[in-house]
Regions:
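Short glycine-/acidic-enriched loop or helix-start segments at secondary-structure transitions
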Residues: 18-20, 47-50, 97, 166-169, ...
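Catalytic metal-binding/acid-base residues of hydrolase active sites
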Residues: 13-14, 42-45, 91-92, 162-164, ...
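Charge-rich, low-complexity terminal tails
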Residues: 180, 195-208
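Short, electropositive alpha-helical surface patch
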Residues: 174-178, 208-214
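Short loop/helix-cap segments at secondary-structure boundaries that form the rim of catalytic
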Residues: 78-80, 204-211
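Proline-aspartate-enriched helix->loop->beta-strand connector
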Residues: 154-159, 192-198
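Active-site-proximal loop/helix segment associated with metal-binding centers of metalloenzymes
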Residues: 67, 81-174
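Core catalytic region of metal-dependent phosphoesterases/phosphodiesterases
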Residues: 1-80, 173, 177-185, 189-190, ...
């Protein structure tokens, strides 16, 4: 079919806060002759994602944003025409040194304006930041179980951030190891894979022969 062409995005698509602009983008994507698959980044609207029903696609859990716009959920292994893919979205935001503001705080506007004047990096809870950007232990365990069932062998891995050792090569001093990059390092050490695709670091290059930053 025309939608047999698959396009993969390694997170950070900004899905999908409520606005006319976002609705236009969703409708535009739904009319394209391809299927867009993506893993969550650290700037998705996780409140909205939580409202989406969970379905099944090629052996793993997914959420359909549109018929051809598919969120690949954390820790899932998918099999497509003999190709095995492991997906694990999420990343820790690095642009929050100024803090996370609570919009219900009586002093919110004063704090917001002060941080803006100072040029600080900050975000607003449930508006531009969600704690669900980082996985919980249940998601880590689900990934391990699914990889165990796959014999720790896949063709491709798609994530938003990457394993700690790869991040050290790719990201510079701005990005420090955390529980997710350490988990992905565990995956990197145990899993046999052909290529690992990831985003998050705002560059496009081969970090190693097998690890590709997009």
């Amino acid at each position: 079919s025309a939608r047999g062409t698959l396009v993969m995005v390694g997170g950070g698509v900004g899905c999908w806060y409520v606005s006319k602009e976002q609705e236009w983008h969703r409708e535009w994507l739904s009319g394209q002759p391809f299927t867009l698959r993506w893993v969550a980044g650290n700037h998705e609207d996780y409140d909205m994602l939580a409202e989406r029903p969970v379905g099944e696609w090629h052996g793993g859990k997914v959420q359909y944003i549109k018929e051809n716009v598919i969120h690949l959920m954390r820790g899932q292994v998918y099999e497509l025409d003999g190709i095995r893919l492991f997906a694990f979205g999420g990343a820790r935001s690095h642009d929050i040194h100024g803090g996370i503001l609570d919009p219900d705080d009586p002093d919110f506007r004063k704090k917001y304006q002060a941080l803006r004047r100072a040029g600080a990096w900050f975000r607003v809870n449930h508006v531009s930041w969600w704690k669900e950007e980082m996985p919980d232990e249940a998601e880590f365990e689900e990934g391990r179980r699914n990889l165990e069932r796959a014999g720790w062998q896949v063709d491709f891995i798609v994530t938003h951030c990457t394993a700690s050792s790869t991040q050290a090569l790719a990201g510079g001093i701005l990005y420090q190891p955390d529980t997710l990059t350490d988990y992905l390092e565990e995956i990197r050490q145990k899993c046999q894979y052909r290529k690992w695709f990831f985003g998050h670091y705002h560059d496009n290059r081969n970090v190693t022969e097998k690890d590709l930053m997009l």
